[in-house]
């Protein structure tokens, strides 16, 4: 029978699931580091912790943290260090994300990029590696840091590319984390949007870069009215992502309450959490921690208003139904030896046609689409 692996992430010497949220404070969204309020951040983390969440994914907004090619903003670093301390105070961890150029429907360049290619411009690659090493050096020994992500959805920021070039870039970026002293698990943050899971050849192949990273992190948002696909596509992607032989972490998932009722949002979370567990996922990081109603005039929310309402808490910090589902799920897992679980063998399997990985000539995008 086909093997059905369930790999666990290992962080701080313990095999345990990550259950958390992607985090921007409601005081600023992507601009939180220039509008940082330590009291509100602690309040936001307290609510998450009280509902069973153990971690967040956090973001170094690139224009703020690297205002010049050879400069790290130490004020932003001081605020991030306080952010780490706030996690430690409530017993939570966080996964910092380095190259945050794309966020919620808009791309944000540092002023000095001037259109340089992130993967092939040697100077630009060196600047990214320096930036990652410098930030890692500052924070790698903080006990709240439990992992690292190179980017946020970089295929829609840096663009797609040749698989060999993308994988060489990934090798250098992961190497920059290790050069800075980071020993925690690391991955790319690319969304696992490669040909293996989508049928579209973006150049980000988990089969190729999988040997460089410690986990694969799908980002799954279903934007359609097919209920079966809505509820099961994330699990399908998790099954396909197992091909890399690494732990699969649901790095981003969620939905805007602009599009669904409170009851429907709870049902979606419940279905996704349990179906991806049975599909081999061993970590879940919801998008995102809060709504942003007070930022309606700020980009990207001014032009993508539905992005304001993916929160698992509202703009005042009150829990929404998805957070209650995360609490229940966390309680269920706390009474389970997740690391000791084995998925039941099955005589069924997913047949992945060779055209997805062989790049056969005269095959079209339509033929590969999943």
Regions found by a protein language model. Give the residues of each.
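Short hydrophobic segments within beta-strands
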Residues: 24, 189, 251, 351-353
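Extracellular glycoside hydrolase catalytic/binding regions
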Residues: 155-279, 307-321
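Redox-cofactor binding/interface segments in oxidoreductases and associated redox assembly factors
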Residues: 58, 217-218, 350
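Active-site mouth of glycoside hydrolases
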Residues: 2-213, 284, 293-294
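Short, solvent-exposed loop/turn and secondary-structure capping segments
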Residues: 32-33, 106-107, 228, 261, ...
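N-terminal-biased segments
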Residues: 1-7, 27-42, 186, 215-235, ...
């Amino acid at each position: 029978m086909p093997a059905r692996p369930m790999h666990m992430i290992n962080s701080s010497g313990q095999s345990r699931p990550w259950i958390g949220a992607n985090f921007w404070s409601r005081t600023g969204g992507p601009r939180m580091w220039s509008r940082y309020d330590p009291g509100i951040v602690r309040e936001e983390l307290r609510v998450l912790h009280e509902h069973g969440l153990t971690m967040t994914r956090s973001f170094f907004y690139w224009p703020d943290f690297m205002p010049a090619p050879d400069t790290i903003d130490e004020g932003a670093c001081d605020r991030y260090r306080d952010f780490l301390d706030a996690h430690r105070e409530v017993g939570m961890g966080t996964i910092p994300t380095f190259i945050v150029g794309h966020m919620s429907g808009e791309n944000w360049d540092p002023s000095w990029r001037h259109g340089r290619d992130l993967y092939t411009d040697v100077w630009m690659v060196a600047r990214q590696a320096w930036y990652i090493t410098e930030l890692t050096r500052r924070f790698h020994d903080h006990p709240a840091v439990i992992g690292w992500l190179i980017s946020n959805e970089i295929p829609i920021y840096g663009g797609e590319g040749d698989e060999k070039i993308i994988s060489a870039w990934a090798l250098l970026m992961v190497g920059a984390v290790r050069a800075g002293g980071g020993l925690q698990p690391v991955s790319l943050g690319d969304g696992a949007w490669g040909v293996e899971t989508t049928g579209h050849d973006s150049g980000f192949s988990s089969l190729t870069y999988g040997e460089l990273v410690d986990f694969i992190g799908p980002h799954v948002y279903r934007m359609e009215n097919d209920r079966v696909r809505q509820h099961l596509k994330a699990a399908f992607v998790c099954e396909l992502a197992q091909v890399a032989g690494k732990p699969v972490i649901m790095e981003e998932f969620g939905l805007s309450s602009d599009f669904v009722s409170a009851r429907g949002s709870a049902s979606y979370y419940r279905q996704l959490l349990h179906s991806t567990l049975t599909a081999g996922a061993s970590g879940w990081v919801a998008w995102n921690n809060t709504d942003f109603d007070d930022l309606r005039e700020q980009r990207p929310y001014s032009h993508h208003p539905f992005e304001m309402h993916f929160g698992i808490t509202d703009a005042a910090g009150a829990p929404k139904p998805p957070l209650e589902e995360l609490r229940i799920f966390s309680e269920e897992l706390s009474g389970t030896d997740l690391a000791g679980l084995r998925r039941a063998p099955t005589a069924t399997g997913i047949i992945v046609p060779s055209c997805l990985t062989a790049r056969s000539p005269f095959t079209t995008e339509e033929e590969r689409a999943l």
